Amino acid sequence: VGKPVAMLLLNGNATVTVCHSKTRDLPEVCRRADILVAAIGKAGMITPDFVKPGATVIDVGMNTITDPAEFKEFFAGNEKREHDFATKGSTLIGDVHPKVVEVAGAMTPVPGGVGPLTIAMLMSNTVKAAKLRRGEKVSSLAVR
């Protein structure tokens, strides 16, 4: 996820910094971002202290929580999530802690954020590819 997103942003003339879980002073580096894309693979790793107030946070992570204690750490007091967890015995969480919403200007949800957008773009590009195969003209296959 990291390299393709970085390339898309670079192609849009953004200044991009790519980090990983072992980046020194990761919270400090993240706090400089106007747009923070999290795809680190660890539930709730990006906490409010990683985020510049007003930043846009895009959470690409998909982690399943089955441990009730871990669930409470992230979702205590969230009645809808508590009901779903009690019913299913698990819940999805991204790489961004839910409390980041209190700091961020905008934040994608998990589930229901990046995943549906990815599916929509794949379908759009599939239709365009089929039209190209039939010799029809189409707009570019690039992500917009």
Stretch-by-stretch model annotation:
Residues V1-V60, I65-F75, K88-P98:
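Glycine-rich phosphate/diphosphate-binding loop of Rossmann-like nucleotide-binding domains
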Residues P68-R144:
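Adenosine-phosphate binding glycine-rich loop
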